[in-house]
Amino acid sequence: MTQWYPASPALWQGRDDSIEAPDARRLFQTVTRSETFSPENWQQKIALMGFACDEGVKRNAGRPGAAGAPDALRKALANMASHQGHERLVDLGNWVAPTPDLEGAQQALRDAVSRCLRAGMRTLVLGGGHETAFGHGAGVLDVFAQESVGIINLDAHLDLRQTDRATSGTPFRQLAQLCDAQSRAFHYACFGVSRAANTQALWRETQWRNVTVVEDLDCHDALAQMTQFIDKVDKIYLTIDLDVLPVWEMPAVSAPAALGVPLIQVLRLIEPVCRSGKLQAADLVEFNPRFDEDGAAARVAARLGWQIAHWWR
């Protein structure tokens, strides 16, 4: 059974420069840590939550270890400088899946996300494998049932696989099927896709589903496509699979990318999403601390989370 735990205060530690000036502060000094899961107490804030689950990665024959990512990323975030927007972060703890019940874990996340959004919060989730996306995205779809929701995925993989059970490779097929069941349009864009990592069958699925696809080779010039997608929806859920980054920037994932999209290009692509006023939910997934020897990859991932919170409007 999936369980909730508050984040350990030991994770939020860092260098104290406050003697220099009142605004010489770091995230460990400005992030609020909640001892209870009580989003109703934090309206207009950003709910920082961990989804400590990699059962979907295991089912997808990947390299397990992403269940340890939420706390590793908190540690990497803690000592980063606090700027405008970061004071809105409230750490609402981790959803921990200690058993192979992935479906139950996804439902728990779905319910938690729905509760946060209905309380007037926005959600920043630290996965976990990309199975995080079904629980997170379903929660967004549940709350904004009468509005068009755009799903923006930065990922080397389309994650539209067809299997007999949920995995880290199926979340967007699951979300598409949920949209079908709710009689609503499925608005999905995937940036950074590696043609070498996705079968022809998956490419056919994108055509049938009318998915916006931008390959890794073309992301240097994709702002217009991103803007067009933003303009056509009411609300946005942004999910970043860290394997979209090249292996030299992000080796600590289940499936490192030989080519990938450099961090600077990823940041330029997500800035208009964050500033659009439409972003309701975002996550970082697939980070695997087992393959991060010196903490450098955690800092790369943390910079993405830091930037999202700073730009979020």
UniProtKB/Swiss-Prot annotation:
UniProt lists the family membership as follows: Belongs to the arginase family.
- Give the reactions, separated by semicolons, that this protein catalyses: N-formimidoyl-L-glutamate + H2O = formamide + L-glutamate
Query: What keywords are assigned to this protein?
Result: Histidine metabolism, Hydrolase, Manganese, Metal-binding
Q: What is this protein called?
A: Formimidoylglutamase
What are the BP-aspect GO terms? Answer: L-histidine catabolic process to glutamate and formamide; L-histidine catabolic process to glutamate and formate; putrescine biosynthetic process from arginine, via agmatine
One annotated GO molecular function is: manganese ion binding
Give the matching PANTHER family.
ARGINASE/AGMATINASE, FORMIMIDOYLGLUTAMASE
The EC class name is hydrolase
Q: Write the Enzyme Commission number(s) for this entry.
A: 3.5.3.8
Q: Does the keyword ATP-binding apply?
A: no
Native species: Salmonella schwarzengrund (strain CVM19633)
Which residues are noted in the entry as Mn(2+) 1-binding? H130, D155, D159, D241
List cofactor names only. Mn(2+)
Cofactor binding note of this UniProt entry: Binds 2 manganese ions per subunit.
